[in-house]
Amino acid sequence: MNNYLETTHDVYKEAALTPDIGLCCTTNPIWELPGLKIPQIMQEMNYGCGSTVHARDLANNPKMLYVGVGGGMELLQFSYFNRQKGGVIGVDVVDEMLQASRENFKEAEAQNDWFKSEFVDLKKGDAMNLPVEGNSIDVAAQNCLFNIFKADDLKKAIAEMYRV
């Protein structure tokens, strides 16, 4: 890893272990949809600055990819539109963030009768080499993650999003 990516990894590892509400520049508004309840811990671990996807883009059960899982909030929101096993893929390089999301999905299951953790397939990987087959995704998204990349790494990450 490059030095700046190692530093970022360390910051998000700590944020997974101890939620840091003020970590990001702002907080995203929570999607208000009938029957969707966002657990408090997911809100506290929402380290994005606004979704790159609008709910109207998620018609017809799209297969979705989300890179940089945070506390799992956007994965839960995307699952609302694709209630199928593995219908949403979440990729993160930080093991602790993946584990935090898994734990948060248990709370989401308790609060949302329609949600099952199996709707989300969490994978270890990074944005510049996604562990996802080419042309297998209908909607690929990220939330502020790409803001940290230097130009060459950003080009690789964008190319990967288009590949899948």
Question: Which stretches of residues belong to each language-model region?
Answer:
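A short beta-strand submotif of the Rossmann-like class I SAM-dependent methyltransferase core
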Residues: 141-145
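Conserved alpha-helix/loop element of class I SAM-dependent methyltransferases that forms part
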Residues: 24-63, 77-81
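A short His-aromatic
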Residues: 81, 147-151
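Class I SAM-dependent methyltransferase SAM/SAH-binding core
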Residues: 60-129
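A short glycine-rich, Lys/Arg-flanked "PGG" loop and its adjoining helix->strand segment in the class I
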Residues: 155-164
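A short acidic, Gly/Pro-enriched loop at the edge of an enzyme's catalytic core
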Residues: 128-140, 152
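N-terminal auxiliary segments of SAM/dcSAM-dependent transferases
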Residues: 1-27
